[in-house]
Curated annotation (Swiss-Prot):
This is Putative S-adenosyl-L-methionine-dependent methyltransferase MAP_3385. GO terms for molecular function: methyltransferase activity. InterPro entries: Ppm1/Ppm2/Tcmp, SAM-dependent_MTases_sf, SAM_mthyl_Trfase_ML2640-like. Keywords: Methyltransferase, S-adenosyl-L-methionine, Transferase. Its EC number is 2.1.1.-. It comes from Mycolicibacterium paratuberculosis (strain ATCC BAA-968 / K-10) (Mycobacterium paratuberculosis). S-adenosyl-L-methionine binds at D129, D158, L159. Belongs to the UPF0677 family. GO terms for biological process: methylation.
Amino acid sequence: MARTDDDTWDLATSVGATATMVAAGRARATRDGLIDDPFAEPLVRAVGVDFFTRWAAGELDAADVDVPGAAWGMQRMTDMLTARTRYIDAFFAEAGAAGIRQVVILASGLDARAYRLPWPAGTTVFEIDQPRVLEFKAATIAQLGAEPTAPVRAVAVDLRHDWPSALRQAGFDVGRPAAWAAEGLLGFLPPQAQDRLLDNVTALSADGSQLVAEVFANTGASGDALNAAGEKWRRHGLDVALDDLGFPGERNDPASYLQQLGWQPVRTPLNQMLANNGLPLQSTEPGAPFAQNYYCTAVLNKAG
């Protein structure tokens, strides 16, 4: 079913289910010794989508559930999440080393960095997402007996609404630099909402703030690859619709847009990240799915 501008979800439906899928990929990468996210598998189990639970537990074989030779699937996603998780973990470590003590995770989903990363003393982590998502994650992690490694402030608001006011009310200090993460987010926003998000991040950011974002091109080829993978997964028990979750239409290139706002962006193509981690590359043939995907880090310098 096509998205609407004010749709909502939990972690077993719509966009929320993609957060569970991503956590399943992190759990699989953790089982393979590629990353260390001990919270991913129990969070996926608690959501209760059987296909993702079996994925997280290592009970599914990629050779059985993936389309042979396809650009997307369980194994491809596990590889990508390995590279992505390492990249963003390193981003936060570098931001902390630079003295940044405010962290904002946009559309945090089942991200558990507030519990698994060694944050410097004085750091506060702000997590922004839909109320049902944040409530579920907090309750599940509390049942595990885990404590955050830095104070966590939940900001329960839709990013298409007035989240800047909610963030400030939660104690965010616009006079101090922040480290922002937009992981797996921008492609799920309407084009104009993507621009508003980056405008708001800029308005809230003091000089020296840093941002990391995943840029996922919503091309016809990438959509076809995602839909083909989803269809194969449904034949193996997936009962959640994962197609048509993005918003079609032309949109501004995030790195170029950020540069116009005073940020100094650096692009890292997806294949470079995969190569840096010794993982199989995606095709770069013209029109190939995901060939345009990249990761962007940026530092704000409003003074120019």
